[in-house]
């Protein structure tokens, strides 16, 4: 089995380090310096780099790392990625230190966003966060909703390795959506204790996300009603002018309403 550990970067980024013995891959190295320090401290040899999407805080360190090690760079083929040697589009299987890893297309945050799945673990970049999901900078609500559905279909004990420590703020929003969700209330207390102790809230557990993350619960009655209320209170005038249906209860419509609410929360 691969060992997975985090390398903190910037204010709240996690660069994921995958190791087997002294061999290593890194995921989304936005900054080379902390990666170089960890590799050198552990006597590790970098063999590959996995990139989920093109944003600078996820690929900014690639050139420097590739100059030090001639590592393969696996990345979305339809995005501009420094040094990409293995362009991917989703659906491929790649070998990561002897572990078969499935490449998943998860558009939404960006159009070419990828996630990397091996049994028990998903490296998802900025698609899913603790109690939240990524902003839709390029994709549509329908695309992101479908991407989240593909993640939700994985086994419940899957550990989710996302790229940012956003859980506490996301939980505050989730409580605004579902104030009576007891699992959510318990998670708020648990995460607060972790963060107070200086510990990360990740990796996430998929089953817990499905019980507490509003973006994975757009089919639940409480989330549907909260989404409709937000649409009615914030979008009524515009919707009426445009002839839009603010009573649309489809999962995509509710996701769009909840995501819009989160953007201004």
From Swiss-Prot:
| The keyword Zinc is annotated on this UniProt entry | yes
Database matches in Pfam families: HAGH_C, Lactamase_B
Which residues hold Zn(2+) 2?
A: 57-58, 126, 164
Q: Which GO terms describe its biological process?
A: methylglyoxal catabolic process to D-lactate via S-lactoyl-glutathione
Q: Enumerate the GO terms in the molecular function aspect.
A: hydroxyacylglutathione hydrolase activity; metal ion binding
Q: What class of enzyme is it?
A: hydrolase
Q: Which cofactors are required for activity?
A: Zn(2+)
Q: How is the cofactor bound?
A: Binds 2 Zn(2+) ions per subunit.
What are the UniProt keywords, alphabetically? Hydrolase, Metal-binding, Zinc
Q: Which reaction does it catalyse?
A: an S-(2-hydroxyacyl)glutathione + H2O = a 2-hydroxy carboxylate + glutathione + H(+)
UniProt feature coiled coil, ranges: none
Question: InterPro entries under this entry?
Answer: Clx_II_MBL, Glyoxalase_II_hydrolase, HAGH_C, Hydroxyacylglutathione_Hdrlase, Metallo-B-lactamas, RibonucZ/Hydroxyglut_hydro
Its pathway is: Secondary metabolite metabolism; methylglyoxal degradation; (R)-lactate from methylglyoxal: step 2/2
ATP-binding recorded as keyword: no
- Binding of Zn(2+) 1: at which residues? 53, 55, 109, 126
User: NCBIfam families from the xrefs?
Assistant: GSH_gloB
- Report the protein's function: Thiolesterase that catalyzes the hydrolysis of S-D-lactoyl-glutathione to form glutathione and D-lactic acid.
Q: How does it assemble?
A: Monomer.
Q: State the similarity comment.
A: Belongs to the metallo-beta-lactamase superfamily. Glyoxalase II family.
Listed name of the protein: Hydroxyacylglutathione hydrolase
Organism whose genome encodes this protein: Dechloromonas aromatica (strain RCB)
Q: Which gene encodes it?
A: gloB
